[in-house]
């Protein structure tokens, strides 16, 4: 870790936005390594994940926050509160907007998901107005959209009075991300780096392992399984030969969901385990022995222990 303060900069930048706006993809892109899980499901990020990006002598700690939406369940309320809290504590905040969903909503051609996304964007704008805050706007998913159209949308957003700067980016291809990163660099205060140079994320290994497996669950059964599953790492043992033994339990709410996760002849669970094990071997840079179990626990999302494990407030 660097210990000089004369030339180095370091600080926090929060990425907020509606579910599925592309926040995790953007953080992974800026860090240059996998920090947050990315699936076709919205609301896959359940707690703020810190990714560490380095640009020259500047270290930016990127806080990938849960999507901000209209919450119903206790877990949803805790996720939204965590998102706003992550933004309030940062030196810079980027509001990431799915411009494809915004345009579809304006043209009355939106899918239900796109319509909800546009509504959630307005909820965020109202929250920023109430807090009297100005943040950076990043219009994401600009691929294939005419520049004149993008400029018109950007003006509409800028006129709300809550944005200091506007960037047009594609988190998936990297277009425009360099300019956004340069802006964040300029906003970081002088000071020593907050993390070692080779650290890309602030996430305990047990929790990282659970997140990787949860991603594989949703990638495999995203159409059949609603947001009724979580993964707990019940054992994480570093062995003398340098390998690690990990035991995890996939919790679902109903027996029918357990059957889906296991699959015919156990093939779905086998795929999840193999995909998760391969990625964990790559991330941890060691051999991984992964053992998965699937358990029905009807009210897992209402357990206080789950909230404390992932840093969320149970009493919301």
Curated annotation (Swiss-Prot):
It is a peripheral membrane protein. Transmembrane segments: none annotated. Its main location: cytoplasm. The keyword Membrane applies. Keywords: Cell inner membrane, Cell membrane, Cytoplasm, GTP-binding, Membrane, Nucleotide-binding, Ribosome biogenesis, RNA-binding, rRNA-binding. Residues 169-171 are annotated as: G5. One of its GO terms (cellular component) is plasma membrane. Residues 140-143 are annotated as: G4. Disulfide bonds: none annotated. Residues 64-67 are annotated as: G3. It is found in: Cytoplasm; Cell inner membrane. Residues 221-298 form the KH type-2 domain. Residues 17-24 are annotated as: G1. Residues 43-47 are annotated as: G2. InterPro entries: G_ERA_dom (IPR030388), GTP-bd (IPR006073), GTPase_Era-like (IPR005662), KH_dom-like_a/b (IPR015946), KH_dom_type_2 (IPR004044), KH_sf_prok-type (IPR009019), P-loop_NTPase (IPR027417), Small_GTP-bd (IPR005225). GO terms for molecular function: GTP binding; GTPase activity; ribosomal small subunit binding; small ribosomal subunit rRNA binding. Belongs to the TRAFAC class TrmE-Era-EngA-EngB-Septin-like GTPase superfamily. Era GTPase family. NCBIfam families: era, PRK00089.1, small_GTP. Monomer. An essential GTPase that binds both GDP and GTP, with rapid nucleotide exchange. Plays a role in 16S rRNA processing and 30S ribosomal subunit biogenesis and possibly also in cell cycle regulation and energy metabolism. This is GTPase Era. It comes from Caulobacter vibrioides (strain NA1000 / CB15N) (Caulobacter crescentus). The gene is era.
